Amino acid sequence: MTIDYLTRPRPLSPRQDILPVIIGGDFGVYGIGRCFNEAFGCRCICVGSQPTESITRSHFFDVRHVSAHATDAQLLDTLMTIAGEHPDKKLILMANHDIFSAFVARNMDKLSRHYALPFPNLEVMERLTDK
C-alpha cells in the first residue's frame, strides 16, 4: 500500500487568524505543529535552541532561535516580541516538555495577556507532577 501525500486531509477553510507558537524543538514539537497545520491550515512558530531538521525544513514552521540556556526573562522577551509582531493573530502557546510547561505556569499572568494558554497554573502543576 502506498500513501498519496497529495490526498492528505486538508482543512475545509484555512484559519489564517490563529498562530500556534510552540516552545521546544524536538520531534514532538513537529507533531504538534503538523496537527495544527493539518487541522487549520496555519503556519506555526517554533521557539527553540536547536530544532530538529523536520522543523527547520518544514513548509509550515518558522523558527525563532533562543539560547539553550535562556533565562525565563530571555524566553519571555522572545515570546513578547512574537506577540508584538502579530497583533492581528490569536496566539496559542504550546510546549512539549515539562521545563517549558513550568516556564509557562510561572509566567502565566504575563503570557495570558497575549496567548491562549492550555496549561494548568503552577500550583496545580506542582501538585500533580511527580517525576
Predicted regions and their residues:
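Preference for protein termini
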Residues: 1-53, 84-90, 95-98, 110-111
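Conserved N-proximal alpha/beta basic substrate-recognition cap immediately N-terminal to
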Residues: 56-131
